[in-house]
A protein has these predicted regions:
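Active-site-proximal beta-strand elements of phosphoester/diester hydrolases
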Residues: 2-9, 111-117, 154-156
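Structural motif
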Residues: 2, 46, 112, 130-132
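Conserved small/polar residues in nucleotide/adenosyl-binding loops
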Residues: 158-164
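Flexible, gly/pro- and Lys/Arg-enriched active-site loops
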Residues: 98-100, 139-157
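Core dinuclear metal-dependent hydrolase active-site scaffold
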Residues: 102-124
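Core catalytic region of metal-dependent phosphoesterases/phosphodiesterases
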Residues: 2-103
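Histidine-centered catalytic micro-motifs
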Residues: 8, 114, 129-140
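Short, polar loop motifs at secondary-structure junctions
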Residues: 79-83, 117-120, 136-139
Length: 168
């Protein structure tokens, strides 16, 4: 199964306030993110993280936290992602800025474009290719895009799957 999520903002205390997250502190936020992630994702699954995994965490703490998240993790880099530490980078099967993939449900295949940022126009958009992105944190501009926002707050701090994307 493929899962999609964005804007975890681990170790970013201000994200609790500016994103109006329902957590008292970082410890509660991290505990809940890990719990919801590992309840849903299995080790054989792939999770596409559409950017902003963390912002101010010490690398040791960040590495330890990301390492316990189940699944094969693909990072579509966002504006807060620093992957210069090889130990951290190795937690991801791939790190890129933009990715085109196919996902399927009930034998039907769909094209998806994955990027941290919303894009005004993308490959095969007129043929129904789905754009998944993060970054905007439910801003009013989201209404202008034929899209699916995968930001943590927008998806109730859990992951999207292709069936839920198709319902949007």
């Amino acid at each position: 199964m493929n899962y999609y999520i964005s804007d975890l903002h681990l170790f970013h205390e201000a994200a609790i306030r500016f994103d109006d997250r329902p957590f008292r502190d970082l410890e509660e936020m991290h505990t809940e993110i890990v719990k919801r992630w590992n309840e849903k994702v299995n080790n054989g699954d792939t999770v596409y993280i559409l950017g902003d995994v963390s912002m101010r965490g010490k690398n040791e703490d960040l590495i330890a936290l990301v390492a316990i998240l189940k699944g094969k993790k693909v990072l579509i880099r966002g504006n807060h992602d620093d992957v210069s530490d090889l130990r951290y980078r190795q937690l991801f099967s791939e790190v890129c800025d933009y990715k085109e993939i196919r996902d399927s449900i009930a034998g039907k295949s769909y094209e998806l474009v994955l990027c941290h940022y919303p894009i005004f126009s993308w490959k095969h958009m007129s043929r129904g290719t789905i754009l998944l992105y993060g970054h905007t944190h439910n801003s009013p501009e989201d209404e202008y895009f034929q899209k699916c926002l995968a930001g943590m707050k927008a998806v109730s701090y859990t992951h999207l799957t292709l069936p839920t994307i198709l319902l949007v």
